[in-house]
A protein has these predicted regions:
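Conserved short histidine dyad/triad with adjacent acidic residue
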Residues: 32-50
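Double-stranded beta-helix
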Residues: 95-144
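Short acidic-glycine-tyrosine-enriched beta hairpin
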Residues: 70-88
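Short, surface-exposed beta-edge/turn micro-motifs
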Residues: 26-29, 52-55, 81, 99-101
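Short beta-strand His + acidic residue motifs that chelate non-heme Fe in jelly-roll/DSBH
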Residues: 65-66, 86, 91-97, 104
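A short, N-terminal "cap"/entry segment at the start of jelly-roll beta-barrel domains
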Residues: 1-31, 38-39, 141-144
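Short beta-strand segments in beta-sandwich/barrel cores
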Residues: 39, 61-67, 83-84
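Short, conserved beta-strand element in jelly-roll/cupin
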Residues: 49-65
């Protein structure tokens, strides 16, 4: 009979930023905690992955996911416990509060081998800012 340690892995990430924690043959699960790139003050880049969908599940704090479809950028205020799947090839990024923690599931090593980054254009920034939820417009002290 197997012992508990070989049957159940427990992983935590309490630090800043993105950290893959569980790896399988073709996928990985990571936790993204607040980091400077997801702060509204640093709104500047957008990314896409050509070989994988990317799943986001908010479990603490507040976050808004923005995705681009053609000339339209849409922002979705994430709800805790809801699964959001960004399909492969879709430009996307996040704006988040400082207490945010998000579960991310994607192809293994996507962050190393399948991430294309670019600066957002002024028209994209305008569309994101126009759709911000109230929590993201509040002064930083209220957003913690």
């Amino acid at each position: 009979m197997a012992d508990l340690e070989s049957c159940l892995e427990i992983h935590r990430h309490a630090g800043v930023g993105y950290l893959p924690l569980v790896f399988s043959a073709g996928w990985q699960a990571a936790i993204l905690n607040w980091e400077p790139p997801v702060d509204l003050a640093n709104l500047g880049e957008i990314e896409r992955h050509s070989q994988t969908d990317e799943v986001f599940v908010l479990w603490r704090g507040r976050a808004a996911l923005y995705v681009q479809a053609g000339s339209e950028t849409r922002l979705v205020d994430l709800e805790p416990g809801v699964v959001y799947n960004v399909t492969a090839g879709t430009w996307h990024n996040l704006v988040a509060s400082r207490d945010v923690s998000i579960l991310i599931v994607e192809n293994r090593d996507t962050h190393l081998n399948d991430t294309e980054l670019r600066s957002i254009e002024d028209w994209e920034r305008s569309q994101v800012l126009a759709q911000l939820p109230a929590w993201a417009r509040q002064p930083e002290e209220e957003n913690r």
